[in-house]
Amino acid sequence: MTHDNKLQVEAIKRGTVIDHIPAQIGFKLLSLFKLTETDQRITIGLNLPSGEMGRKDLIKIENTFLSEDQVDQLALYAPQATVNRIDNYEVVGKSRPSLPERIDNVLVCPNSNCISHAEPVSSSFTVRKRANDIALKCKYCEKEFSHNVVLAN
């Protein structure tokens, strides 16, 4: 790295880096996945330059590691994301999200008549890949929605 190339977001000693998040999605991920419910330091880079994507978001969470299920649930929002496991400032593991069969406790059913809005139950959706889309079926009302409809909710 030359003196002209600087890290735009400070390195972390130990934790998780979620890189290659589409621009404007970083805050949504923080909220949906409750990543801010920690006392650990979180660094967010928004609209950073990216050779591949043009612009990207980035999230770094110190002393916190995502489970495989959490990584896979990112696939709906950031299918090209890379999740890096950091230890002693070095990348010790890399993973990419793959579409899970089910997503629990993250999304909200867009059907206003769904029982999940009135009862204290955790959301649960079955994930199905379609030709040009991803379908999400609510466990409670059994209605199927395009993932874009659920994500916009």
Swiss-Prot record:
Taxonomy, superkingdom: Bacteria
Gene Ontology MF: a single term: metal ion binding
Assembly and oligomerization: Contains catalytic and regulatory chains.
GO biological process, one term: pyrimidine nucleotide biosynthetic process
Transmembrane spans: none
Signal peptide: none
Family, similarity comment: Belongs to the PyrI family.
Entry annotated with the keyword Metal-binding: yes
Name used for this protein in its record: Aspartate carbamoyltransferase regulatory chain
Pfam families (alphabetical): PyrI (PF01948), PyrI_C (PF02748)
Higher taxonomy: Bacteria, Pseudomonadati, Pseudomonadota, Gammaproteobacteria, Enterobacterales
Native organism: Escherichia coli O7:K1 (strain IAI39 / ExPEC)
GO cellular component: aspartate carbamoyltransferase complex
SUPFAM superfamilies listed in its UniProt record: Aspartate carbamoyltransferase, Regulatory-chain, C-terminal domain, Aspartate carbamoyltransferase, Regulatory-chain, N-terminal domain
Keyword list, A-Z: Metal-binding, Pyrimidine biosynthesis, Zinc
Role noted for this protein: Involved in allosteric regulation of aspartate carbamoyltransferase.
Ligand binding (Zn(2+)): 109, 114, 138, 141
Cofactor(s) named in the record: Zn(2+)
Annotated cofactor note: Binds 1 zinc ion per subunit.
